[in-house]
């Protein structure tokens, strides 16, 4: 389960390491849980590029994911594990005993036929979701809320997990995948276990075209541009004769861009390490 290395039959397969999709049990999404997804090619509502290197790619349907896990006390059976083109993780289709269907991010170790539940009285096992105050110290969690009821915002990518380190009054101390130590309010929900598909980091697309299928466009070096397009542009030869900067003139290579005096500073015990 995870990835497979292709034989070097062509240039495009020579270095390719791709998913084997062994964990997938259902190929078509649940119709009631998908909606159209409009492409924006990295543009905002003014038509300006706010995210570079985006555009094209295969047409997608958006899968509606339950990040809130707010259906408490009702067991749900894992009906299928599916591919989701909108994220690196897989998703699990749940059939609740009252007839409702929902998608969640697939945690490592959750199998078709398993039963899971959400709520403060749920058992501590993979796939169950509880408030942080009810989860023992040392437990690995994912899909962590920052505001109660808003839905999980942290630790949602393939293979990721955070660890609960301790409690301080109304807050729980968590180590995030980046290495950051942070306090999160104890009433926020989190799901037990690590996100599945840890092999995602081994993926090698193998050719430019596979990036284009994903909607990723080429990244052009600043030194290959004209002076009007980038601070590194122009000049004779390959030197740009200054400290490296971003396209907007901010120093790059280690320069901190997080603005000072942010509200969340008081919740960050230790900043992320390299």
Swiss-Prot record:
Molecular-function GO terms, alphabetical: rRNA binding; structural constituent of ribosome; transferase activity
Isomerase found in the keyword field: no
Keyword annotations from UniProtKB, A to Z: Ribonucleoprotein, Ribosomal protein, RNA-binding, rRNA-binding
A single GO BP: cytoplasmic translation
Pfam families, per the entry: Ribosomal_L2, Ribosomal_L2_C
Superkingdom, taxonomy of origin: Bacteria
Keyword match Ribonucleoprotein: yes
Cross-referenced SUPFAM superfamilies: Nucleic acid-binding proteins, Translation proteins SH3-like domain
One Gene Ontology term, aspect cellular component: large ribosomal subunit
Renumbered residue ranges of the record's region Disordered: 221-254
Known function: One of the primary rRNA binding proteins. Required for association of the 30S and 50S subunits to form the 70S ribosome, for tRNA binding and peptide bond formation. It has been suggested to have peptidyltransferase activity; this is somewhat controversial. Makes several contacts with the 16S rRNA in the 70S ribosome.
Subunit and partners: Part of the 50S ribosomal subunit. Forms a bridge to the 30S subunit in the 70S ribosome.
Entry similarity comment: Belongs to the universal ribosomal protein uL2 family.
Name recorded for this polypeptide: Large ribosomal subunit protein uL2
Natural source organism: Sulfurihydrogenibium sp. (strain YO3AOP1)
Classification of source organism: Bacteria, Pseudomonadati, Aquificota, Aquificia, Aquificales
Protein encoded by which gene: rplB
């Amino acid at each position: 389960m995870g990835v497979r290395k292709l034989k070097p039959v062509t240039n495009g397969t020579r270095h390719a390491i791709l998913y084997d999709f062994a964990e997938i049990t259902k190929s078509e999404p649940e119709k009631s849980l998908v909606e159209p997804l409009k492409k924006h090619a990295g543009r905002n509502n003014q038509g300006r590029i706010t995210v570079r290197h985006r555009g094209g790619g295969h047409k997608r349907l958006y899968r509606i994911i339950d990040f809130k896990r707010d259906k408490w006390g009702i067991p749900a059976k894992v009906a299928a594990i599916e591919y989701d083109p909108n994220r690196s993780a897989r998703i699990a289709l749940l059939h609740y005993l009252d007839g409702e269907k929902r998608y969640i991010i697939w945690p490592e170790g959750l199998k078709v036929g398993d039963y899971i539940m959400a709520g403060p009285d749920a058992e501590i096992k993979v796939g169950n979701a509880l408030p942080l105050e009810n989860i023992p110290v040392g437990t690995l969690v994912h899909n962590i809320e920052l505001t109660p009821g808003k839905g999980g915002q942290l630790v949602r990518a393939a293979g990721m997990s955070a660890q609960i380190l301790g409690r301080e009054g109304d807050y729980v101390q968590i180590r995030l995948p980046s290495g950051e130590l942070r306090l999160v309010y104890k009433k926020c929900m989190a799901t037990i276990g690590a996100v599945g598909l840890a092999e995602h980091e081994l993926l090698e697309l193998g050719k430019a075209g596979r990036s284009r299928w994903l909607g990723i466009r080429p990244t052009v070096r600043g030194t290959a541009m004209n002076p009007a397009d980038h601070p590194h542009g122009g000049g004779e030869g390959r030197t740009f004769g200054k400290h490296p900067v971003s396209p907007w003139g901010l120093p790059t290579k280690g320069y901190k861009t997080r603005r000072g005096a942010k509200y969340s500073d008081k919740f960050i015990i230790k900043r992320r390490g390299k």
